Amino acid sequence: MREVQGYPLPLGVQISENKINFSIAVPIEKKCQLLIYRAGRKRLYRQFEMETAVGEVRCIALTDIEPAEYEYNYLINGEVVVDPYVQALAGREHWGVKKETARHEIRGRFLSQEYDWEGDHTLQIPYHQVIAYSLHVRGFTRHA
């Protein structure tokens, strides 16, 4: 795992062929670090200073890293923070179990950008034939 120059946009995590780019908005006067953990393990694995900034956007990229094997958070002025642009969380797998970000129990996970849609496409239903409703899915299925 090596640190290389990152790019500021888009914010969040971007996975490319051979590197992962991290980008987050942090006020200039605050110190920011990237925390890397091995997936499923409690202890911090590596820590990187995020010194490169474009305005208030800090960025860093890592090469030689397998996304499925790692998780991440940020340390901003001594406070562990989950990425506000995170696509998936680790540590929230069980409903109602309280965990704390400060204890490194909740972290960002990496999602693969590749998904095989197997020829799926949008439904071609005329609007006047649609029956639509909304509900809170997690609350609706909580006791199922």
Set out the residue ranges of the language-model regions:
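Short beta-strand segments in beta-sandwich/barrel cores
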Residues: 31-32, 135
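Beta-strand signatures of extracellular beta-sandwich domains
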Residues: 33-35, 73
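Short proline/glycine-enriched turn/loop motifs at strand-loop junctions of beta-rich domains
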Residues: 25-31, 67
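Beta-propeller domains
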Residues: 39-41
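The feature marks proteins involved in alpha-glucan
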Residues: 1-19, 45, 52-144
